[in-house]
Amino acid sequence: MYAIIKHGGKQYKVSEGDFLNLDHFEAEAKSNVEIDEVLAVNDGSLKVGAPFIKGAKVVLEVVGEGKDKKVVIYKKRRRKDSKLKRGFRRQYTRVKVTSIKA
């Protein structure tokens, strides 16, 4: 059984027991979060919403927070002695899918 959920403008395919790194949101560790923006559920037969399935939800358990590896942005203009170097680390919230209710 799997579901396709929408969170933070992105879509994720999830199954029970999966771990995900979602965009950072405020939640305490060991707390449960319910997502009701379920686009599709497959439990032997595929159910697709328009755009969401009414009454379906995915329950997530917050494991913790963290940061991704650094991405380096480097810009240079030739022969101008102009350069720019920046770094960026995306913050995420790590969650575990505990149940899918369709």
Curated annotation (Swiss-Prot):
PANTHER family: 50S RIBOSOMAL PROTEIN L21, LARGE RIBOSOMAL SUBUNIT PROTEIN BL21M. The keyword Mitochondrion does not apply. The gene is rplU. Keywords: Ribonucleoprotein, Ribosomal protein, RNA-binding, rRNA-binding. This protein binds to 23S rRNA in the presence of protein L20. One of its GO terms (molecular function) is structural constituent of ribosome. GO terms for biological process: translation. One of its GO terms (cellular component) is cytoplasm. Part of the 50S ribosomal subunit. Contacts protein L20. This is Large ribosomal subunit protein bL21. The lineage of its organism: Bacteria, Pseudomonadati, Campylobacterota, Epsilonproteobacteria, Campylobacterales. It comes from Campylobacter fetus subsp. fetus (strain 82-40). Belongs to the bacterial ribosomal protein bL21 family. SUPFAM superfamilies: L21p-like. InterPro entries: bL21-like (IPR028909), bL21-like_sf (IPR036164), Ribosomal_bL21 (IPR001787), Ribosomal_bL21_CS (IPR018258). Signal peptide: none annotated. It comes from the Bacteria.
